[in-house]
Amino acid sequence: MKLTWIKCMSKTERISDIDEPRLFEENGVEAHIAAFVMPLLKPLGFRLVRVKLLGLNGLTLQIMVERPDGSMTVEDCETVSRTVSPLLDVQNVIERKYHLEISSPGIDRPLVRKSDFFHWQGHIAKIETKIILEGRRKFRGTLTNITQDGFTLNTDKAAYGESMYISIPFDDIIDAHLVLTDELIRDALKKNKDLSQQFISEDNQKLSKQERNYKN
């Protein structure tokens, strides 16, 4: 069945999949930077979310990064910055002066991998497609029925005669991100709390084992 790859994914497998490919990639200079940065991130335990050049208040190079579990601390951002910044300068990938910004995806994050859609199923997202579906290319609705090939969007507002449920293949997406809602904030905070407790529990188990070895 096509759902096997998602329904059989354990929490540990989802967390450890640092090599999961993104659904879409950058173009031009951004694509060049992404290709250069990705091999630098993996040994550090991070994966790329996206690269974006922003022109507000001067040129800003935003590199959005996360750990495979979706977490990203201030210290993590500093680690990535110290690794990436000097090498970008050596490569001279951007000829003009720019500001480097290493950031986490945030709560209203971009959805760039299939596991992102699975992880945030049930929440509202904005989707843009490369082809016209149901007479348009931009959609907003709740993510449901995630499969290996795509998902169903339960749209907020359907025009007269249009279906409220739209099936969207992953191959047809060019942009997707979550919409900030109270429910999303609560769920994101809960997931982060559960993850922190899991790591604390694992650390306690290691300490207990070390104590037993010491006593023996």
UniProtKB/Swiss-Prot annotation:
The keyword Cytoplasm applies. CDD domains: YlxS_C. GO terms for biological process: ribosomal small subunit assembly; translation. The keyword Cytoplasm applies. It is found in: Cytoplasm. Keywords: Cytoplasm, Ribosome biogenesis. GO terms for cellular component: cytosol. InterPro entries: Ribosome_maturation_RimP, RimP_C, RimP_C_sf, RimP_N, RimP_N_sf. Its main location: cytoplasm. Required for maturation of 30S ribosomal subunits. NCBIfam families: PRK00092.2-5. Belongs to the RimP family. This is Ribosome maturation factor RimP. It comes from Bartonella henselae (strain ATCC 49882 / DSM 28221 / CCUG 30454 / Houston 1) (Rochalimaea henselae). The lineage of its organism: Bacteria, Pseudomonadati, Pseudomonadota, Alphaproteobacteria, Hyphomicrobiales.
